Amino acid sequence: MAKGSGRAKAAGGKGGSKQIIATNRKARHNYSIIETYEAGVALQGTEVKSLREGQASLADAFATIDDGEVWLRNLYIPEYQHGSWTNHDPRRNRKLLLHRQQIDRLVGKIRDGNLALMPLSLYFSEGKVKVELALARGKKAYDKRQDLAQRDAQREVVRQLGRRTKGMI
């Protein structure tokens, strides 16, 4: 017997869609991304409820590897508004769920080069909270200026092409 059709999955509301909760825009500006990984996040109940309300901040967040486990530090998830004394600590360290081979590969790459683990986005995928984790290298000031100049040049090219197709030139 077949494992099931995709139509039943879509009807159940569990498609492959992502519902983005928070993004770390500064990470893409301050770091050059080498590789990305998707990791699950071990959360408490009130944290998930707070995330369902769309409340989180990745601004100061980073990941570390301690004793073969990956931890997400400084992720801010505010206390659940309707929670009681069982509410969570908003800045507690949260364990990331990765395969052992992925963790070993990350440990080797971080040890070899001057690399960091940065969270890029936090999202729901099929009802589970996931984080897009990037292996990244810090940019120098001149790298950031080059990126801005390239972006401005690309924007100008698109603007000129738009004028040409509209017959303004």
Swiss-Prot record:
InterPro entries: SmpB (IPR023620), SsrA-bd_prot (IPR000037), SsrA-bd_prot_CS (IPR020081). It comes from the Bacteria. GO terms for biological process: trans-translation. It is found in: Cytoplasm. PROSITE patterns: SSRP. Transmembrane segments: none annotated. One of its GO terms (cellular component) is cytosol. Gene3D superfamilies: 2.40.280.10. It holds the Pfam family SmpB. Keywords: Cytoplasm, RNA-binding. One of its GO terms (molecular function) is RNA binding. HAMAP family: SmpB. Belongs to the SmpB family. Required for rescue of stalled ribosomes mediated by trans-translation. Binds to transfer-messenger RNA (tmRNA), required for stable association of tmRNA with ribosomes. tmRNA and SmpB together mimic tRNA shape, replacing the anticodon stem-loop with SmpB. tmRNA is encoded by the ssrA gene; the 2 termini fold to resemble tRNA(Ala) and it encodes a 'tag peptide', a short internal open reading frame. During trans-translation Ala-aminoacylated tmRNA acts like a tRNA, entering the A-site of stalled ribosomes, displacing the stalled mRNA. This is SsrA-binding protein. The gene is smpB.
